[in-house]
Amino acid sequence: MLELKDPSLLKQQAFIDGLWVSADSGETFAVTNPATGDELARIPQMGAAEAERAVLAAHRAFKPWKRKTAKERAELLQRWYALMLENQEDLARLLTAEQGKPLAEAHGELGNGMSFVQWFAEEAKRVYGDTIPQPSADKRLIVTKEPIGVTAAITPWNFPHAMITRKVAPALAAGCSMVLRPASQTPLSALALVALAERAGIPAGVFSVVTGSATQIGSVLTGHPLVRKFSFTGSTPVGKLLIGQCAETVKKVSMELGGNAPFIVFDDADLDLAVEGAMLSKFRNAGQTCVCANRIYVQDGIYERFAEKLAAAASGLRLGNGVEAGVTQGPMIDENAVRKVEEHISDALEKGARLIAGGQRHALGGSFFEPTVLTEVTAQMKVAHEETFGPLAPLFRFSSEDEVVELANATEFGLASYFYSRDIGRVLRVSEDLEYGMVGVNTAAIANEMAPFGGVKQSGLGREGSRYGIEDYLEIKYVCLGGVDR
């Protein structure tokens, strides 16, 4: 049984136009704990009709919200942030229960997610326009930035708190309203967040959460003419489909899509620091992150030593229910996720890779999978081209800088990349040559509220976080004043 200090944060209804509501059909779906299989809650299985009502409510709420001063919106966001801080233990327990990650990681996600609310509360007061030198004496040229209107978002299950706050916070700070459809595996965090937003005094209709059918709700959010901006975090194939749906009404879109992150370790790297970074990048959240190391390239001179150290560190992870003390890796989200890891391991071993750690389902059963390390991995294996999204670390060999940069860039993806070196010239060269939206040099901890998060190529469009993040929720308006010299 899930025990919370404030049991009212465990919501089993959706939130539309300031009201807690069930599905029109009365249908529900179960949310289960991936560590135990226990049912946590039953959530409304909503569809197009409920999504339509949420959009109309957001449209009605938009103008009054837009007309609030930046300071007023900032104060409400700060109240929301304060309530998250006050309830962070319950929020962490909800997150671990529905998603599976260890409690320590859940607290880490909360810290990151809450920081976006605090940051954008301040950025609300820093949306500046311009004046442009006029072409003639009788004119004045003014540029303003205005909220785009009703916005919508679909968020994933791997970070059910942070993926929401980094979309909702800039939207509300800019003066937009937002309709959110969270992943069906992890809706409890979203519902707790909107409950706290309600307590903070954010007006009805400004932030609604609709749970249920991805197809039906998604079709409304991408196709409705009143929705002017759509944000999505998820796979590249689904992102492409959603972009096509948004094209019918020419919506502004933000997409944070798939990755195939290279993690490069040069001979001159601090070996222990590189192993520490690889552990964080590869095994955090059981490898279920869009920016996790998917291909680990290690230079010939340190390959064996790195492999030995990484295998030892991976074997030292303790698997279990995330609420138990000392657990450092939880379960994978579901059976399909486990099967993909097994498929990549099997394919690699058939083609000549060597298993030096893990490689199978854990004795705990369910969707627990052992942290796995493979050596002698080559570009002909599936793991070189497909995002594993699991606790599998494949080690590739390389000889030269030029070779590894070419290998790292040989993908349609371009989200995150990492490399370790103590040569300043190499640091500058490789940083410039890697075709990725984000590059971590001698660190795997790159995500924070002050930096622009996003990818290039088929990894996405737009940026989240930083001063650039609020721009995706603004439109530029140019005003030309004539006859002012009279």
From Swiss-Prot:
PROSITE patterns: ALDEHYDE_DEHYDR_CYS, ALDEHYDE_DEHYDR_GLU. It catalyses: (2S)-3-sulfolactaldehyde + NADP(+) + H2O = (2S)-3-sulfolactate + NADPH + 2 H(+); (2S)-3-sulfolactaldehyde + NAD(+) + H2O = (2S)-3-sulfolactate + NADH + 2 H(+). Pfam families: Aldedh. It is an enzyme of class 1 (oxidoreductase). Keywords: NAD, NADP, Oxidoreductase. InterPro entries: Ald_DH/histidinol_DH, Ald_DH_C, Ald_DH_CS_CYS, Ald_DH_CS_GLU, Ald_DH_N, Aldehyde_DH_dom, Aldehyde_DH_Superfamily, Succ_semiAld_DH. The keyword NADP applies. NADP(+) binds at W157, N158, R181, P182, A183, S184, G234, S235, L257, E387. The active site is at E256 (proton acceptor), C290 (nucleophile). One of its GO terms (cellular component) is cytosol. One of its GO terms (biological process) is gamma-aminobutyric acid catabolic process. Its EC number is 1.2.1.97. Induction: Is highly up-regulated during growth on sulfoquinovose, compared to growth on glucose or succinate (at protein level). The keyword Secreted does not apply. GO terms for molecular function: succinate-semialdehyde dehydrogenase (NAD+) activity. PANTHER family: SUCCINATE-SEMIALDEHYDE DEHYDROGENASE, MITOCHONDRIAL (PTHR43353:SF5). Catalyzes the oxidation of (2S)-3-sulfolactaldehyde to (2S)-3-sulfolactate, using both NAD(+) and NADP(+) as electron acceptors. Is involved in a degradation pathway of sulfoquinovose (SQ) that allows P.putida SQ1 to use SQ as the sole carbon and energy source for growth. Belongs to the aldehyde dehydrogenase family. NCBIfam families: SSADH. This is 3-sulfolactaldehyde dehydrogenase. It comes from Pseudomonas putida (Arthrobacter siderocapsulatus). The lineage of its organism: Bacteria, Pseudomonadati, Pseudomonadota, Gammaproteobacteria, Pseudomonadales.
